[in-house]
Amino acid sequence: MTKNPSQFVGDELPVDQVSWEDAMDFCKKLTAQEKAADRLPEGYEYTLPTEAQWEYACRAETTTSLNNGKNVTTVADERICDNLDEVGWYWMNGGKENWNARKDSAFGTLSALCTHPVGQKKPNNWGLYDMHGNVAEWCLDWAGEYPTSSVTDPVGPDASTERIHRGGSWFYGPRYCRSADRSTGKPAERTLNVGFRLALTPVK
């Protein structure tokens, strides 16, 4: 738990270059550490949020595509989206001046396009920062189709080949940073635009 695997290292930067497996291993170690120190509520553990829990926390009772009550609305927003700029880091405010360079460059080669210190953008109604952009965040669920009927707190399919991550990142355009957007990755996959956020939940 002492090694930071991130490509972009700083005390206030989100972790990146962590797989789903890495994140779950961290959660298990943190749970054991906090339990041993008697700092963990009885019957609770640290884990990743389910996809449903993540979106619920991101939206904070909003119904718009962004959690500031605004939307990603136009084709022009695929480049510059002022509504998203209020709450998240994405590929244009992560280095707008390098747009043409970004189009012609390989993934991860632009120093101006990177993670940013957390807490610089506006939080949502529940005080959560960086739910849009910066790094995408692993969720507990296997990837699968949404349920066809109403379900409370769904947990995804029992098995698949990929896990969900949500929120978009500094490398994504606005449409991929919406509250509802979802993407996937192999459980062992590590990339410089995906990290994770902890959830404290009852042990199941």
Language-model regions: role of each:
Residues 191-204:
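Short, structured beta-strand segments at or near domain termini in extracellular proteins/domains
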Residues 9, 14-181:
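Functional-site microenvironments in short loops/helix caps that host divalent-cation chemistry
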Residues 1-11:
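Short, conserved catalytic-motif segment at the N-terminal edge
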Residues 3, 32, 50, 200-202:
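Generic detector of low-complexity/intrinsically disordered segments
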Residues 159, 188-190:
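A generic structural micro-feature
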Residues 182-187:
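Short, P/G- and charge-enriched loop/turn segments at secondary-structure junctions
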